[in-house]
């Protein structure tokens, strides 16, 4: 197994405190099958945590959308190793499967536009019936917070699910600081009680759904 560090940290004990980490959780098999979502590779996904299971959401993708995942990995690999993964073996012909439109979006510190943040804002602004959200951390940008509040005030059924217990008490306290203003706008808030909710998903009007590794916080959007 060829393992390479992404932006290697000199002091590993500080790695979880520094910005510009690679937060993506993707798997591509033979350029034809992809997996994406919130799951890391760690014992806790099998063993759970002290207060219950580790609840996450990951999806399997086939068809041309796999190219998007392969491209994201290839760019990161090239950045880290200075090697190009451009051979046809990595991008084989892939037939269309099913009838669902899938778009792969990535964001990072490089680039003029924040594709994931903008897509969330557009989808939320276009909602007519409901917005259902699962996220382990809720530290929204001002624009995202206002978009959710406006939707709820416009009689859209907005529901937010967070973990009752968090792996980061500090982040949990920060997340809870936003909840009063959400409740005042009519947003319904639920707490997952069977363990730690690590899933990052949004479903809107049974027409739009996003599943990935983006938390609803300003750090993920940047």
Predicted feature descriptions by range:
Residues 1-222:
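Charged, low-complexity intrinsically disordered terminal segments
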């Amino acid at each position: 197994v060829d393992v390479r560090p992404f932006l290697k940290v000199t002091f590993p004990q500080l790695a979880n405190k520094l910005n510009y980490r690679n937060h993506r959780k993707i798997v591509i098999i033979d350029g034809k099958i992809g997996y994406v979502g919130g799951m890391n590779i760690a014992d806790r996904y099998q063993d759970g945590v002290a207060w219950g299971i580790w609840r996450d959401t990951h999806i399997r993708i086939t068809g041309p959308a796999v190219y998007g995942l392969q491209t994201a990995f290839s760019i990161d690999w090239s950045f880290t190793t200075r090697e190009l993964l451009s051979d046809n073996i990595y991008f084989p012909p892939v037939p269309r499967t099913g009838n669902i439109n899938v778009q792969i979006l990535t964001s990072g510190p490089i680039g003029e536009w924040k594709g994931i943040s903008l897509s969330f804002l557009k989808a939320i602004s276009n909602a007519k019936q409901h917005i259902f959200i699962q996220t382990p951390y809720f530290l929204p940008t001002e624009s995202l917070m206002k978009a959710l509040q406006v939707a709820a005030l416009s009689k859209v059924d907005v529901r937010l699910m967070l973990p009752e217990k968090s792996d980061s008490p500090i982040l949990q306290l920060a997340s809870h600081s936003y909840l009063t203003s959400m409740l005042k706008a009519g947003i319904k808030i639920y707490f997952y009680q069977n363990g730690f909710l690590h899933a990052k998903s949004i479903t809107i009007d049974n027409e739009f759904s996003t599943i990935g590794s983006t938390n609803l916080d300003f750090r993920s959007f940047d």
